[in-house]
Design a protein with these regions (language model features):
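Thiamine diphosphate
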Residues: 95-107, 125, 131, 135-138, ...
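Cofactor-binding active-site loop characterized by glycine-rich and histidine/acidic residues
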Residues: 35-175, 387-388, 420
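Acidic-glycine-rich active-site phosphate/pyrophosphate-binding loop
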Residues: 4-15, 48-50, 87-108, 381-395, ...
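Non-catalytic terminal/interface segments that mediate subunit docking, oligomerization
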Residues: 314-453, 531-543, 549-550, 556-559, ...
Length: 664
């Protein structure tokens, strides 16, 4: 049997798997798995250079299903291609604890490169992986051994490409001339509510051409020869990324809904029996023929042979380049130097600098200790102060640069940084003003969901921003970030706490961290030992001022308000303890004995001070405690004036303690 015939059989049987899985659970999305089946057949049956027996192979092609709602497309092809995804798991689609969740999830399913579902994120992730691949080649390839030379493919639909994050990411990909990236556009002219022309009229392919992509259009998206030829041209292109518009029929194989918005979801599954007959499939559900099984078993063996050839080259590279090999190993295992905290120089006792400015010295010290540390910014390196000196920028002509210039594209920055983290090897970060963290929130949420070891630098953290006014004063942002599960949010008080914050972010390999830094200068709190401050951040909270005699009042604070709390405590008396809580999440993870030593239950007289909304502090101060916060938007005036006007002063903290009967 000719390969073309067997691939068509595979495409139709993949359609059958999708129909049966979605019919069995009465939910899911049929449109893409049926409409793009021939695309899947060519990718997994012919084009992708992967090793299904090892889905972590370093030089594998990356395939990202950006349109994650079409997850049965991916699960069906991963099963057929021989990944560790048994048919029983396909049958368990969308069931509790299965390997086939409703949308693809990184770490849950072999062969799934990243979590997708929120449309457009996968395009940004793919751009990040393509950047990481170029970085890896620049850092590790030699003239004798090319160990990184794979491609990145993303399958996206109309919904993905209508999202702003995809537009931002694609614009940057074109600018960087990422010739290892191919975006496959499942162009079926349908969205969920209606035909696509009800909400868009531009030429998408022309838009991508303007971004700097090589573009082509396949009029019949079910013509596998045309798809294969286009993919070959994309792989051969060494000048720019490729965009292939593939005209498909949504829900092809179910005549009752094919080509209509009704074919998007699970509705067509009720025609499952008739659809199987139309596709030439037997009555048996979840049917895969012996011929298709044999074809993919043979292909898996061929891919294994190619992998063995790469392994031999890789072994020779390791032998010839032991230092590069050791660096690569450290990146893969996400090693952090044991003495990382000591690699950051201490600040002068009388230093008076913004924590963002302190971060400049810190990240440059850390970059020397961690050669795979990457720092990016959304056109704000000069303000966020996270530019790494003497390592260059990543550009289309310099793939070894370690600074990423994202432009004013916060959302894409979040998705691209996620893609670099998914790739492994590098430790990426991004930076913008704290108030713009909401522009990237979906990407931040996904990084937390997947436990990606990245960190974000969010500066200009409060009403102290001043004259720019309430549009740029993030009173609610820190609290809004703290409620994202598995995201550590650290708001350091001074330069030494900031050193601890950066190190905490890098030491954490099971999730993301956000650093909330000041625009305004803050004093170095040298009355507290340096190591106490640095190591205290690692625990999330610590005693910054020990009471004398009986403990009568605890004041908790974070960031720039720690100094305010310390000054207020001096006025309130010697029986006042001040606790610095730069990171609630880290503090809450400490064992009960440590938390009790810092916040003893026996002392219920508590107050908290932070220049932001007060809500989350109430879990520490209790029903009778007081929070001196800012539960309103700010105003335009010099920062000190705004702080005073909104109650962020020593006198007001003392006053509020007295009014609540909390005075020591």
């Amino acid at each position: 049997m000719q390969n073309q015939e067997i691939l068509q059989q595979a495409a139709d049987q993949a359609r059958g798997l999708a129909i049966d899985a979605i019919h069995a659970c009465s939910s899911g999305h049929l449109g893409l798995p049926l409409g793009a089946a021939e695309v899947g057949a060519v990718l997994f049956g012919k084009d992708l250079k992967v090793d299904p027996s090892d889905d972590q192979w370093l030089n594998r092609d990356r395939f990202i299903l950006s349109a994650g709602h079409g997850s049965m497309f991916l699960y069906g092809w991963l099963h057929l291609a021989g990944y560790d995804l048994p048919l029983e798991e396909v049958k368990n689609f969308r069931k509790l604890h299965s390997k086939t969740p409703g949308h693809p999830e990184y770490g849950e399913t072999p062969g799934v490169e990243c979590t997708t579902g929120p449309l457009g994120q996968g395009v940004g992730n793919a751009v990040g992986m393509a950047i990481a691949s170029k970085m890896a080649a620049a850092h590790f390839n030699t003239s004798e051994h090319e160990i990184f030379n794979h491609q990145v493919f993303a399958l996206a639909g109309d919904g993905c490409l209508q999202e702003g994050v995809a537009a931002e990411a694609a614009s940057l990909a074109g600018h960087l001339a990422l010739d290892n990236l191919t975006i496959l556009y499942d162009s079926n002219d349908v969205t969920l509510d209606a035909m696509a022309d009800a909400s868009q009229s531009e030429s998408v392919i022309d838009r991508f051409a303007s971004y700097g992509f090589a573009v082509e259009k396949i009029e019949d998206g079910h013509d596998m020869e045309a798809i294969s030829a286009a993919l070959e041209r994309a792989r051969a292109n060494t000048e720019k990324p490729t965009f292939i518009e593939i005209k498909t029929t949504i829900a092809k194989g179910i005549p009752e809904v094919a080509g209509t918005s009704a074919g998007h979801g699970e509705g067509g599954a009720k025609f499952a029996e008739a659809a199987r007959q139309g596709l030439g499939l037997p009555e048996e559900t979840f049917y895969v023929s012996d011929e298709v099984r044999t074809f993919f078993a043979d292909r898996k063996a061929q891919l294994g042979e190619a992998r063995q050839q790469w392994d031999a080259s890789y072994a020779a590279w390791r032998s010839a380049n032991p230092e590069k090999a050791a660096l690569l190993d450290s990146g893969i295992s996400r090693d952090v130097p044991a003495d990382l905290l000591n690699s950051v120089q201490e600040f002068a006792a009388d230093a008076n600098v913004a924590t963002r400015a302190a971060g400049s010295q810190i990240i440059n010290d850390l970059a020397k200790a961690m050669p795979l540390l990457i720092s990016g910014s959304a056109d704000l390196h000069g303000s966020t102060k996270n530019y790494i000196k003497e390592v260059g920028d990543f550009t289309k002509n310099n793939h070894s640069g370690r600074n990423l210039l994202f432009g004013i594209r916060e959302h894409a920055m979040g998705a691209i940084v996620n893609g670099i983290a998914y790739y492994g090897i590098f430790r990426p970060s991004g930076a913008t003003f704290a108030v713009f963290a909401d522009y990237m929130r979906p990407s931040v949420r996904l990084s937390a969901l997947m436990g990606l070891p990245i960190f974000h630098i969010w500066t200009h953290d409060s009403v102290a921003v001043g004259e720019d006014g309430p549009t740029h004063q993030p009173v609610e942002t820190t609290s809004g970030l703290r409620v994202i599960p598995n995201l550590d949010v650290i708001r350091p008080a001074d330069p030494e706490e900031t050193a601890g914050a950066y190190v905490a972010a890098l030491q954490r390999i099971d999730g993301p961290t956000g650093l909330i830094l000041t625009r305004q200068n803050v004093p170095n709190l040298s009355s507290i030992p340096v190591q106490t401050r640095r190591e205290g951040v690692l625990k999330g909270g610590y005693i910054a001022r020990q009471e004398q005699g009986e403990l009568e009042l605890i004041i908790l604070a974070s960031g720039s308000e720690l100094n305010l709390a310390l000054q207020a405590a001096e006025k309130l008396g010697s029986s006042v303890r001040v606790v610095s809580v730069p990171c609630m999440e880290r503090f809450d993870r400490q064992d009960d004995s440590y938390r009790e030593s810092v916040l003893p239950r026996s002392c219920r007289n508590r107050m908290a001070v932070e220049a932001g909304v007060s809500d989350l502090w109430r879990k520490y101060v209790g029903l009778d405690g007081v929070v001196v916060g800012i539960d309103r938007f700010g105003m335009s005036a010099p920062g000190d004036t705004v702080l005073e006007e909104l109650g962020m002063s020593v006198d007001n903290v003392v006053k509020q303690a007295a009014l609540a009967g909390l005075s020591a």
